[in-house]
Design a protein with these regions (language model features):
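Glycine/aspartate-rich loop-and-adjacent alpha/beta segment that forms the canonical ThDP
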Residues: 1-23, 28, 32, 171-209
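Conserved thiamine diphosphate
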Residues: 2-10, 131-167
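General beta-strand structural signal in soluble alpha/beta enzymes
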Residues: 35-40, 63-64, 89, 153-156, ...
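Long, charge-dense
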Residues: 119-129
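Glycine-rich beta-alpha junction loops
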Residues: 40-43, 121-123, 180-186
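Active-site diphosphate/adenylate-binding microenvironment
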Residues: 3-68
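Thiamine diphosphate
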Residues: 46-120
Length: 209
């Protein structure tokens, strides 16, 4: 396993990137077998926008509505249920902070096919931009490492983000990738139909026709 020593050691050393841009880059690297769980808020909205294509919307995405902090637990459950499938959790810093216990659970389980991507803008943007703990000194990647997730790293910039996603697709995890992002509004808004989101995702995982 290659070292992560060349990546930033703290949040302040990472470049501030655009959420939609890096989400689009990640989705573009995926095939049709990886599952992606989008947490609530603008992270979710940009995943929705980035996953549309002339061939239709990506069925292997699940868009969480209304409940904070559940992208990582849901992704862990999918990864356990389908260990042959790479599973990604996309979550904002505020939601991760709400469910910090999930990180130690992921570390204890050591699920090899799981990657967590944290979009960290230091704010609860969708509710008015109130500062999160990461905006006041907390380092979510440092917290993840202390929780037992050794393969945790800040993406220094867009190229480093692509490199880390590529490694997570090829190497065993669990992985956690921290991304400092800007406060730009999302490109689109996720559809508000929970049953349709569920059914499409289940078809994408091959558990429903």
């Amino acid at each position: 396993m290659a070292s992560l020593a060349n990546h930033p050691t703290s949040r302040d050393q990472a470049k501030v990137m655009n959420r939609y841009d890096i989400t689009k880059r990640m989705v573009g690297m995926l095939h049709q077998d990886e599952a992606v769980i989008g947490g609530i808020g603008y992270t979710n909205f940009d995943l929705w926008a980035a996953s549309d294509s002339p061939h239709g919307r990506r069925q292997q995405n699940f868009y969480m509505l209304g409940s904070m902090g559940l992208a990582v637990p849901i992704a862990l459950g999918v990864a356990i249920a389908q260990p042959f499938r790479k599973v990604f959790a996309l979550e904002g810093d505020g939601s991760v902070l709400m469910q910090l216990g999930a990180l130690s659970t992921v570390a204890a389980r050591a699920q090899k096919n799981l990657c967590i991507v944290i979009m960290d803008n230091g704010a609860y943007q969708i509710t008015g931009g109130q500062a999160t703990a990461t905006g006041q000194g907390a380092d979510i990647v440092g917290i993840a490492r202390a929780s037992g997730l050794a393969q945790s790293a800040w993406a220094a910039d867009e190229d480093a983000f692509v490199e880390l996603i590529c490694r997570s697709l090829k190497e065993d995890g669990p992985w956690l990738i921290g991304c400092r992002i800007d406060n730009q509004k999302p490109v689109d808004t996720t559809e508000r139909d929970p049953a349709r989101i569920r059914d499409r995702f289940m078809r994408g995982l091959g558990v429903r026709k």
